Regions:
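His/Glu-based metal-binding/catalytic segments typifying zinc-dependent metallopeptidases
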Residues: 55-110, 247
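Short amphipathic alpha-helix segments
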Residues: 110-118
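Charge-rich, well-structured scaffold segments of protease-associated domains
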Residues: 1-54, 87, 117-258
Length: 258
């Protein structure tokens, strides 16, 4: 927050927020590892006196394309290009994960190979997804020098256009599918990760998927699924761009995003 928003806060402000948003009917306690029935009884007793009031009314997010530029005395520019993605409960969430991985999920990804390795236009480039309950984002980050910024952004956009024309190569889809499944399985070997996974799933989706169901969902994603999703997502009229460092003019970025 800012000084202006923090100054008026009192202890009652925080207590009221707790009562409104931290309600027992909205609480999930996830437990993994070695535990007993007595442990579960203790947890239930511990939370039995938790109180809340009212009903959470959360306004659905309304995405608006935007351009954000901030001058900062740093050695490189940081760019984040984002598009509306899919939610945590969308049928397309597995295809979205694979799309993100193919484009910018590591050193063998399209953007890393094209923008960094083959053309040397950036220090780093990768993609990431930000799924929420009712919406989501697919974002592309790159860190680079101001002198290569235009070329890099233009190349990134051309790579997206090419992908929307032809979709993924069979070996790309196969590699990223296996990476996603392997990462999932290895993550569940850690009891802490398993606890977070089941808790988040139950809280946000109201169910915990079996690992076999998740693996099968990845196996059922086709190249056409990813291509159709990419064509829906990479709509330049819906693109948002944030630049921190020594940004160019707004007109320059708007022209590139046309």
């Amino acid at each position: 927050g800012t000084a202006e928003t923090l100054e008026p806060m009192t202890s009652e402000t925080l207590h009221k927020y707790m009562r409104e948003y931290y309600r027992p009917q909205d609480t999930v306690v996830a437990v993994s590892g070695h535990f007993t029935d007595e442990d579960l009884d203790f947890i239930e007793e511990l939370f039995s006196e938790m109180q809340g009031e009212g009903k959470n009314v959360i306004t659905p997010a309304a995405y608006q394309p935007s351009l954000f530029l901030r001058d900062k005395e740093i050695e490189q520019n940081h760019l984040c290009l984002s598009f509306p993605g899919v939610s945590l409960v969308s049928e397309d969430r597995f295809a979205m994960n694979l799309l993100s991985s193919i484009l910018g999920g590591g050193m063998s990804s399209r953007l890393f190979q094209s923008v960094r390795e083959q053309n040397g236009l950036c220090y780093s480039v990768y993609t990431f997804t930000t799924p929420h309950l009712d919406t989501g984002l697919l974002s592309i980050y790159t860190g680079l020098g101001q002198e290569t910024e235009r070329k890099a952004l233009d190349l990134i956009l051309r790579e997206l256009d090419e992908f929307c024309q032809n979709g993924p190569e069979p070996d790309e889809l196969s590699r990223c599918r296996e990476q996603a499944k392997t990462t999932l399985l290895m993550g569940l070997e850690n009891t802490g990760n398993r606890m977070m996974t089941i808790g988040r799933s139950e809280l946000l989706r109201g169910e915990v998927s079996k690992i076999e169901e998740v693996l099968d969902s990845y196996d059922r994603v086709t190249a056409d699924d990813i291509l159709n999703l990419a064509r829906r997502v990479f709509d330049r009229s819906k693109a948002s761009l944030a630049v921190v460092g020594q940004p160019d003019s707004e007109d320059t970025y708007r022209e590139l995003l046309r």
